[in-house]
């Protein structure tokens, strides 16, 4: 026992000696130590940061009990061959059919709906109105989320009926900020969108739904407005997604056959396919491919950093071979020397890991700042990274950092350790060094990895440039947009038209109109459509669902949308509709849609198709146009949320904000402009997600290329140092410096070029996995490959020229005398 303790003590003492000696050696060469630590910090820190994104967005369950049972219903065209552009979306049902879905979908234990709103709130009588983020939801939503209030209660089932007294549940932050955290807040009344509502509950600080910005919740009442909204549900115990999908599809198809009935029409919409998908999967599906691409880019960056550090360590150890040879000659075993080298490597890796943690903290903070600043939630909801506020460096991320640091330390120290462990004294003299083949292999690997990273980043950047230049189908220039919020009860179509007329009368205003939704505002408002008369046999059914756009008669001209056939809506013909080119091409009205009559779900008809509108990309520039119909806003159901206004002006749209506010106040003194932005800002905000990922991918790729260039520089500098005597002799016998310069860089450039070709080949093989995140280009885009290859080759050549230029300044006599 004592002997074992003595052996352990001896081992620990030797390790401590190795540690102290390694610390002294690293302190003697601060430049080398700083470069290695910085290189590892970038690699390990970037890896930790992207791991925190993957863990928070893709892996971490939602913060609700049994969150894997919370589901949304996805609707797709039943026949893929008939998919004429309608994108995968949430299935929507009429609110009147919600009880039917609850009763017949036996695989779902709870079914409800919710919708985010910007509510106008008056906390106390006489206080100014506040515009706070809120959510209208069914009482069943609180139940399925397992919500437990900190004070009071949640909504009762009966409170989703219109006849009940208005109630509200407030969030913890609203309770603290506006009520001082007083427990007597229950029973107090506040005015929410013109309705005096009683506070019945306060949610705990940790509760967030649907996001952290929501401050209050009101019941979603199932009234007669005939709104269409996507449901949210919880699976019953023991029910799989597949079983629920089958049950829900059968129920929704029965519902679709009965809603709404089109008198005199024998045509029915084409059937749809429905499937149940977990909420987490629905949230992350749009960003998963992009996050995987970023994770791959960071993996390449980490590998480049490891290769770079390995090369630096090999060169450093080569310069210390005489010291190592003396140690072995004095009795130290190769294994003892190898252990010391490993200790030094792990020490520098630990320092790099510690610096990497700081780098990761900064990177995550920057990511959250960029994600928040680049995507305004009020303009285009759903374009930022989901669960962005949950991304952080926590204990899980730090544990990952420790693991990756140890792995990196072992990886970069492997070659030097093996070299010394297998060494003999006779081979470790002053001139021993890494073999030429070893240096060439490192150079090829670095160049190949950097090329692949640059190609991936270049493809994303090129794709974003293509996306940003897509024609949206309207003119976004010189266009001011906003919503109208009032402390009085919900406005009427007459009020909205008065506002539009007053805006149109302002000097410099060319056109003004309003619509239920703007393009790029990612909510779908779909429903069935049918011909008003029987169609000949063989006529295809209408596509399902069809995007319904409720607009004022002057909205089309204000947006700069182009009528390709027929005319636009007029003030005197409320029974007229417009349809887009995609819907016309579906052929459900025969060869010519213009002049035909249709029945529109939820609205008294029939309606005449008076014009065909050029396709507009309503849900994003990367989304194909859906089949769309434009209905006059006079059919907007009463009580609907305030519409979006579009005002076309001369000059800078933002300079018209003050006059627009004044014009609105002249009509309604309690009204104010909300969500104010130019249409160009709205479009740009809709591009925030692909822009952010393109910037991050490019940054990681450039960082990888920079590290690779440093590696090329280091290998070339070492080669020049090793060949100084040979080059000095050549200079002494008359060789020209330029010829020696070419001789010095020839091998580095040659092996870099080989690595470039290997990287291009690897990029061709791997870039096909980017197919789903690219727009307007192919994964083998020749422009990107050419530009990236040329740019990296230029950078690599410059990296070799910098150390090689020292040859021209070499004095042969001095060089020969010092060697």
Which residues are covered by each model-predicted region?
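Alpha-helical transmembrane segments of integral membrane proteins
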Residues: 2-34, 279-284, 312-339, 343, ...
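Small-residue-rich transmembrane alpha-helices
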Residues: 50-53, 310, 346-423, 459-462, ...
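Alpha-helical transmembrane segments
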Residues: 42-76, 364-375, 449-478, 717, ...
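N-terminal membrane-entry
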Residues: 284-300, 396-400, 685-704, 746-750, ...
């Amino acid at each position: 026992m004592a002997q074992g303790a003595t052996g352990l003590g001896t081992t620990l003492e030797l390790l401590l000696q190795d540690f102290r000696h390694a610390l002294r050696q690293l302190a003697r060469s601060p430049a080398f130590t700083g470069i290695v630590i910085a290189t590892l910090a970038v690699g390990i820190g970037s890896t930790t940061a992207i791991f925190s994104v993957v863990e928070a967005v893709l892996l971490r369950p939602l913060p609700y009990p049994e969150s894997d049972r919370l589901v949304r219903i996805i609707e797709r065209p039943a026949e893929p061959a008939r998919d004429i552009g309608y994108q995968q979306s949430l299935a929507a049902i009429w609110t009147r059919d919600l009880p039917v879905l609850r009763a017949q979908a036996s695989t779902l234990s709870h079914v409800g709906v919710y919708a985010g709103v910007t509510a106008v709130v008056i906390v106390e009588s006489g206080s100014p109105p506040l515009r706070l983020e809120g959510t209208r939801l069914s009482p069943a939503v609180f139940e399925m989320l397992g919500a437990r209030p900190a004070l009071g209660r949640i909504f009762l089932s009966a409170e989703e009926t219109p006849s009940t007294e208005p109630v509200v549940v407030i969030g913890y932050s609203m309770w603290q900020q506006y009520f001082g955290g007083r427990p007597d807040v229950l029973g107090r009344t506040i005015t929410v969108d013109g309705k005096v509502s009683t506070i019945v509950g306060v949610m705990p600080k940790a509760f967030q739904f649907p996001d952290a910005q929501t401050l209050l919740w009101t019941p979603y009442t199932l009234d007669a407005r005939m709104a269409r909204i996507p449901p949210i549900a919880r699976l019953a115990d023991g029910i799989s997604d597949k079983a629920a999908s089958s049950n829900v599809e059968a129920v929704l198809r029965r519902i679709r056959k009965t809603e709404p009935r089109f008198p005199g029409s024998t045509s029915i919409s084409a059937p749809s396919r429905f499937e149940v998908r977990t909420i987490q999967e629905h949230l992350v599906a749009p960003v998963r491919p992009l996050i995987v691409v970023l994770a791959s880019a960071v993996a390449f960056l980490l590998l480049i950093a490891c290769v770079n550090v390995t090369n630096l360590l090999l060169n450093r150890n080569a310069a210390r071979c005489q010291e190592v040879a003396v140690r072995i000659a004095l009795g130290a075993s190769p294994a003892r020397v190898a252990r010391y080298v490993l200790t030094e490597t792990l020490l520098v890796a630990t320092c790099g890991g510690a610096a990497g943690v700081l780098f990761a903290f900064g990177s995550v903070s920057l990511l959250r700042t960029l994600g928040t600043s680049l995507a305004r939630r009020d303009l285009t909801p759903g374009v930022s990274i989901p669960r962005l506020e949950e991304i952080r460096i926590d204990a899980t991320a730090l544990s990952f950092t420790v693991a990756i640091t140890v792995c990196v330390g072992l990886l970069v120290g492997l070659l030097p350790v093996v070299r010394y462990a297998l060494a003999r004294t006779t081979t470790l003299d002053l001139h021993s060094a890494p073999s030429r083949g070893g240096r060439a292999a490192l150079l090829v690997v670095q160049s190949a990895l950097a090329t692949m990273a640059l190609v991936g980043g270049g493809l994303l950047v090129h794709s974003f440039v293509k996306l940003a230049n897509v024609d949206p189908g309207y003119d976004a220039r010189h266009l001011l947009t906003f919503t109208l919020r009032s402390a009085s009860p919900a406005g009427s179509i007459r009020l909205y038209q008065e506002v539009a007329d007053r805006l149109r009368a302002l000097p410099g205003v060319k056109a003004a109109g309003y619509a239920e939704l703007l393009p790029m505002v990612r909510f779908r408002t779909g429903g069935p459509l049918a011909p008003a008369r029987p169609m000949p046999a063989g006529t295809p059914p209408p596509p399902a669902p069809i995007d319904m756009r409720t607009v004022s008669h002057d909205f089309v001209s204000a947006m700069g949308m182009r009528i390709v056939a027929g005319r636009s809506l007029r003030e005197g013909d409320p029974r007229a509709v417009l349809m887009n080119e995609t819907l016309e091409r579906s052929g459900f009205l025969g060869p010519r849609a213009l002049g035909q009559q249709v029945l529109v779900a939820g609205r008294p008809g029939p309606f005449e198709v008076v014009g065909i509108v050029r396709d507009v990309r309503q849900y994003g520039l990367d989304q194909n146009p859906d089949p769309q119909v434009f209905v006059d806003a006079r059919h907007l159901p009463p009580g609907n949320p305030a519409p979006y206004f579009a005002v076309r002006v001369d000059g800078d749209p933002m300079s018209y904000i003050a006059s627009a506010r004044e014009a609105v106040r002249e009509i309604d003194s309690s009204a104010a402009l909300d969500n104010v932005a130019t249409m160009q800002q709205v479009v740009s905000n809709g591009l925030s997600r692909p822009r952010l990922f393109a910037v991050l991918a490019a940054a990681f790729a450039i960082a990888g290329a920079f590290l690779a260039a440093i590696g090329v520089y280091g290998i070339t500098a070492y080669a020049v140092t090793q060949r100084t005597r040979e080059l000095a002799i050549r200079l002494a016998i008359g060789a020209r410096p330029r010829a020696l310069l070419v001789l010095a860089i020839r091998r580095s450039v040659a092996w870099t070029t080989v690595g470039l070709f290997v990287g291009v080949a690897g990029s061709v093989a791997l870039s096909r996995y980017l197919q789903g995140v690219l727009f307007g280009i192919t994964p083998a885009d020749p422009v990107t490959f050419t530009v990236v290859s040329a740019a990296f080759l230029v950078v690599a050549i410059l990296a070799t020229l910098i150390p090689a230029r020292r040859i021209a300044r070499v004095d042969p006599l001095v060089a020969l005398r010092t060697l």
